[in-house]
Amino acid sequence: MSNISRQAYADMFGPTTGDKIRLADTELWIEVEDDLTTYGEEVKFGGGKVIRDGMGQGQMLSAGCADLVLTNALIIDYWGIVKADIGVKDGRIFAIGKAGNPDIQPNVTIPIGVSTEIIAAEGRIVTAGGVDTHIHWICPQQAEEALTSGITTMIGGGTGPTAGSNATTCTPGPWYIYQMLQAADSLPVNIGLLGKGNCSNPDALREQVAAGVIGLKIHEDWGATPAVINCALTVADEMDVQVALHSDTLNESGFVEDTLTAIGGRTIHTFHTEGAGGGHAPDIITACAHPNILPSSTNPTLPYTVNTIDEHLDMLMVCHHLDPDIAEDVAFAESRIRQETIAAEDVLHDLGAFSLTSSDSQAMGRVGEVVLRTWQVAHRMKVQRGPLPEESGDNDNVRVKRYIAKYTINPALTHGIAHEVGSIEVGKLADLVLWSPAFFGVKPATIVKGGMIAMAPMGDINGSIPTPQPVHYRPMFAALGSARHRCRVTFLSQAAAANGVAEQLNLHSTTAVVKGCRTVQKADMRHNSLLPDITVDSQTYEVRINGELITSEPADILPMAQRYFLF
């Protein structure tokens, strides 16, 4: 076999085992751990290339070959950083390995035939579509904005720009649940709705779950009392759905200890666990120490910068229907914004004590920045804290796996949808995001939804080639017509599926049920399962783990920022 230089190989087929790649303009470097393609037998499409009839393409019928192959992809997922071909069949991942013609090539696990389409992933990073679990359904255009950032699944509640939806992620009652399920049937992303969990009558919660929501949201603006928390968790345990909690900032109905007592060791997803987004002041952050608490952040406080504190007061006043002329409203808002706990939040993510990131879309958070801000935090922590002690070798692979899990597999596990989405694994929906390494986390090169391209940057439609300016993101065929129904999923509760809600509402999209919501624990959070001994000083708000002060310096400059948005 002839040899070529490592540089020439990377230029032709993408990086291979041992090669290092910088992520965007951050200080994060990954190293390829394994290469599942076979040296000398790589497949590539194009003039004079391998994927031609009788060469890398076989003669089998469609039943015996992939519908789509992503060739020579560099996969970043919680389970590894690996070079491989990815095979897709019927909208799902059916193999990760070596593509080609099994009649003449060795080690082929993904047959290529005349029915196979090719996406050239040489020199591209491929990640699973992101899962955002904190969506305020204020406007439907959020779906396209999220999709262009690499988010393919959106979980939350709302009914449009109402006072309730501007502040809380709740779709209240069967009538609104039905309307929102029908409205979402045409969105180009997977969705799951959260009902309003603020009720101490279990029947009022059961009917919402039976109508189709996949979880119940408890929000302080509707009253997050111990009775409400206990009732929602009781119904959730009965019907296998998740409960999401925005707890009582004002400590009116109890303190964080009372909320934990009401939770009673049952699984619960705590939203914006730092507290600037809401929750017991000043110590809701201590909830991350408990094995049944699945703690997440929303992106307004990520990463901590010199502008974070100043930005929050006005955002909070608008989103939570507060009046700047009422002193009590201003005091409420100010009680949630604490520099000390915000400064600790990034570190808790880096330690793996906080397990998820999400947006809080149009309700203090930015729906198109979950991916970007997650990686900005990872960069800041690398710069401030150095390599993680778990790292082996001159790379950031452990840190990268920790951070990618925060918006892919961990939210999917938390909300009972990991059997369908959240990672690049066989059997799951082919929701895949391709990135040029230089634009990683900022601007995807291609977004594949259910095995078909749903969104991509596209140039002048009257151009002679696809690339002339102006180039901007445009919906592709997976987002149009009846194809979008086959390429997306609406998640329902098991009760709603049993009741035939999809048929009653004449939903056209594929549906899937959530499961395992009540058994998932912090220990199941991939790379993010630390249970710290954490305290907050009630006077100074200083956060300590095992007595050691946990803080970080605010950033005055960030990667993945202005230089990427000049065009």
Curated annotation (Swiss-Prot):
<dbReference type="InterPro" id="IPR005848">
    <property type="entry name" value="Urease_asu"/>
</dbReference>
<dbReference type="GO" id="GO:0009039">
    <property type="term" value="F:urease activity"/>
</dbReference>
<dbReference type="InterPro" id="IPR011612">
    <property type="entry name" value="Urease_alpha_N_dom"/>
</dbReference>
<protein>
    <recommendedName>
        <fullName>Urease subunit alpha</fullName>
        <ecNumber>3.5.1.5</ecNumber>
    </recommendedName>
</protein>
<comment type="similarity">
    <text>Belongs to the metallo-dependent hydrolases superfamily. Urease alpha subunit family.</text>
</comment>
<feature type="binding site">
    <location>
        <position position="134"/>
    </location>
    <ligand>
        <name>Ni(2+) 1</name>
    </ligand>
</feature>
<feature type="binding site" description="via carbamate group">
    <location>
        <position position="217"/>
    </location>
    <ligand>
        <name>Ni(2+) 2</name>
    </ligand>
</feature>
<dbReference type="InterPro" id="IPR017950">
    <property type="entry name" value="Urease_AS"/>
</dbReference>
<dbReference type="InterPro" id="IPR006680">
    <property type="entry name" value="Amidohydro-rel"/>
</dbReference>
<dbReference type="GO" id="GO:0016151">
    <property type="term" value="F:nickel cation binding"/>
</dbReference>
<dbReference type="InterPro" id="IPR011059">
    <property type="entry name" value="Metal-dep_hydrolase_composite"/>
</dbReference>
<feature type="binding site">
    <location>
        <position position="136"/>
    </location>
    <ligand>
        <name>Ni(2+) 1</name>
    </ligand>
</feature>
<dbReference type="GO" id="GO:0005737">
    <property type="term" value="C:cytoplasm"/>
</dbReference>
<feature type="active site" description="Proton donor">
    <location>
        <position position="320"/>
    </location>
</feature>
<keyword id="KW-0378">Hydrolase</keyword>
<keyword id="KW-0533">Nickel</keyword>
<dbReference type="InterPro" id="IPR029754">
    <property type="entry name" value="Urease_Ni-bd"/>
</dbReference>
<feature type="binding site" description="via carbamate group">
    <location>
        <position position="217"/>
    </location>
    <ligand>
        <name>Ni(2+) 1</name>
    </ligand>
</feature>
<keyword id="KW-0963">Cytoplasm</keyword>
<feature type="binding site">
    <location>
        <position position="272"/>
    </location>
    <ligand>
        <name>Ni(2+) 2</name>
    </ligand>
</feature>
<comment type="pathway">
    <text>Nitrogen metabolism; urea degradation; CO(2) and NH(3) from urea (urease route): step 1/1.</text>
</comment>
<dbReference type="Pfam" id="PF00449">
    <property type="entry name" value="Urease_alpha"/>
</dbReference>
<dbReference type="GO" id="GO:0043419">
    <property type="term" value="P:urea catabolic process"/>
</dbReference>
<feature type="binding site">
    <location>
        <position position="219"/>
    </location>
    <ligand>
        <name>substrate</name>
    </ligand>
</feature>
<keyword id="KW-0479">Metal-binding</keyword>
<dbReference type="InterPro" id="IPR032466">
    <property type="entry name" value="Metal_Hydrolase"/>
</dbReference>
<feature type="binding site">
    <location>
        <position position="360"/>
    </location>
    <ligand>
        <name>Ni(2+) 1</name>
    </ligand>
</feature>
<feature type="binding site">
    <location>
        <position position="246"/>
    </location>
    <ligand>
        <name>Ni(2+) 2</name>
    </ligand>
</feature>
<comment type="subunit">
    <text>Heterotrimer of UreA (gamma), UreB (beta) and UreC (alpha) subunits. Three heterotrimers associate to form the active enzyme.</text>
</comment>
<dbReference type="InterPro" id="IPR017951">
    <property type="entry name" value="Urease_asu_c"/>
</dbReference>
<feature type="modified residue" description="N6-carboxylysine">
    <location>
        <position position="217"/>
    </location>
</feature>
<dbReference type="Pfam" id="PF01979">
    <property type="entry name" value="Amidohydro_1"/>
</dbReference>
<dbReference type="InterPro" id="IPR050112">
    <property type="entry name" value="Urease_alpha_subunit"/>
</dbReference>
<feature type="domain" description="Urease">
    <location>
        <begin position="129"/>
        <end position="567"/>
    </location>
</feature>
